[in-house]
Design a protein with these regions (language model features):
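Catalytic strand-loop segment that frames the active site of acyl-thioester-processing enzymes
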Residues: 2-37, 54
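HotDog/MaoC-like acyl-thioester-processing domains
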Residues: 3-10, 14-20, 75-76, 87-142
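Active-site helix/loop of acyl-thioester processing domains in fatty-acid/polyketide metabolism
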Residues: 38-58
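Small beta-barrel nucleic-acid-binding modules, principally OB-folds
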Residues: 57-73
């Protein structure tokens, strides 16, 4: 199984597809003036969910994530870029590696801020686990 290590090569290139890109706003700050870690986690969960829906061809739910280490703060004005890649697919669940990178305000400097592996389960209309279909021939992206 492929696992994301937030501390490994923090300034290498992102792995996976750019799935979510958003700007960090003043309303998202913690008491120290940095962006609240829960906001970053939420963006990562959304990105993982998008990748999961694409792969499962239907609804998915987050059931777990491995340990996360925030290695750098995100600041107001930074563009948070979240990259995803499916690393394992089981019968009803999948693991998706998710990396969050900050493009620093008004610069082209890009730094990894955290990473984790999320586990998603494909569900049917009743919310029960369902089999994940074979991988489609070509991903559908807008």
């Amino acid at each position: 199984m492929d696992r994301v290590d937030a501390d490994a090569q923090p300034d290498s290139q992102p792995l996976g597809d750019l799935t979510v890109r958003t700007i960090a706003m003043p309303a998202d700050t913690n008491a120290n003036g940095d962006i609240f870690g829960g906001w970053v986690l939420s963006q990562m969960d959304q990105a993982g969910g998008i990748a999961g829906v694409d792969r499962a061809q239907g609804r998915v739910v987050t059931v777990a994530l491995d340990a996360m280490t925030f290695i750098r703060p995100v600041r107001v004005g930074d563009v948070l870029c979240v990259y995803t890649r499916v690393v394992q697919v089981g019968r009803t669940s999948m693991k998706i590696a998710v990396e969050a990178w900050a493009r620093r305000f008004c610069t082209q400097i890009r730094e990894r801020v955290t990473a984790a592996t999320f586990t998603f389960v494909a569900i049917d209309e009743a919310g029960r686990p369902r089999p994940i279909p074979p991988e489609p021939e070509a991903p559908v992206r807008p």
